[in-house]
């Protein structure tokens, strides 16, 4: 899937460069910043596959991969949604920051304060979004940080090729620019709540969910499954987060501590912040949320990229207006599970 997605990206990029006359950059049809970021997002996922969206400030929102339209799901206080973070060390600097722009003032005032997941984590001070479907780029910067980050999202869409336009994948590239005259040790990690089985009717993962580490031909990553859910449920299935990158040090975890008073994300954050790597939690009681991390060196005044892909397989699509009739998904006939799609 990674090679297929990259080939599709190259084909689309060639067309886009001709169309938008942007030889070295991703194409841009519109630019958004300020208040506009609150309402813009790039849906990523093939035709008829569902989607995950890259928001204007870099969050991953609108998780609609389990056969149910569900705008705003995991955008608000439905627990800790998946997120990416960056740790930077070098040039007299050390910090850990969520890879997302600032929270809008309109999101701060609710019954219990801010209702945005991970609202207490440090974020980049500035964000803007450039879009030209199927491409979108979030630009992150902060005067207090020695790096700038571009988050490049890509949805599989190849005009004239319905098969390659119908893949259950959301592709992401995190390009880090070193603004200093010294090399920087940079780690990018993803915290992934095991949301398999959480289709919006239920915010809590069903009992028996599993998270496992896998390796394949040119790809490594995590697979999240809802093992004990009714296998006829539209929410039964799996999703995966993987990377084709081999030029860095990879670490991961397949479990986190239980979420008492938001302890899950805090313990994960502390683990990542300590050395830019992930390790298994020091706890006898765990839950199947996971994370994957890649540490690289970004040269002085240089740029380095991290590549990730979310894939999924939830085969039991119900008929429109009749949940008792399962019509299925075309993509599920081609892939046994989410890892097979990776």
Task: Name each model feature, range by range.
Residues 57-71, 312-319:
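Short, surface-exposed, low-complexity cationic segments
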Residues 12-22:
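Hydrophobic h-region of N-terminal signal peptides that target proteins for export
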């Amino acid at each position: 899937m990674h090679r297929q997605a990259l080939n599709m990206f190259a084909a689309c990029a060639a067309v886009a460069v001709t169309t938008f006359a942007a030889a070295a950059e991703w194409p841009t049809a519109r630019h958004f910043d300020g208040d506009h970021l609150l309402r813009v997002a790039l849906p990523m996922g093939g035709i008829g596959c569902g989607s995950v969206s890259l928001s204007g400030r870099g969050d991953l929102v609108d998780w609609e991969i389990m056969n149910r339209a569900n705008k705003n799901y995991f955008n608000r206080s439905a627990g800790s949604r998946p997120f990416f973070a960056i740790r930077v060390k070098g040039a007299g600097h050390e910090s850990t920051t969520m890879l997302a722009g600032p929270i809008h003032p309109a999101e701060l005032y609710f019954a219990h304060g801010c209702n945005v997941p991970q609202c207490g984590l440090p974020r980049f001070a500035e964000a803007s979004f450039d879009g030209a479907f199927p491409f979108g780029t979030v630009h992150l910067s902060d005067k207090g940080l020695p790096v700038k980050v571009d988050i490049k999202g890509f949805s599989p869409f190849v005009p004239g090729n319905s098969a390659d336009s119908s893949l259950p994948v959301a592709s992401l590239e995190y390009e880090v620019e070193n603004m200093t005259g010294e090399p920087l040790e940079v780690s990018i990690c993803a915290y992934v709540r095991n949301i398999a089985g959480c289709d919006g009717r239920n915010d809590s993962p069903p009992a028996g969910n599993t998270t496992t580490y896998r390796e394949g031909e040119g790809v490594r990553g995590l697979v999240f499954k809802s093992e004990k859910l009714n296998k006829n449920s539209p929410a039964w299935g799996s999703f995966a987060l993987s990377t084709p990158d081999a030029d860095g040090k990879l670490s991961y975890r397949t479990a986190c501590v239980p979420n008492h008073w938001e302890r899950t994300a805090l313990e994960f954050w502390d683990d990542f912040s300590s050395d830019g790597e992930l390790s298994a939690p020091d706890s006898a009681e765990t839950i199947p949320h996971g994370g994957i991390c890649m540490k690289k060196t970004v040269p002085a005044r240089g740029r380095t990229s991290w590549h990730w892909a979310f894939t999924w397989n939830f085969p039991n699509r119900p008929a429109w207006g009749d949940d008792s009739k399962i019509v299925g998904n075309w993509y599920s006939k081609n892939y046994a599970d989410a890892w097979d799609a990776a």
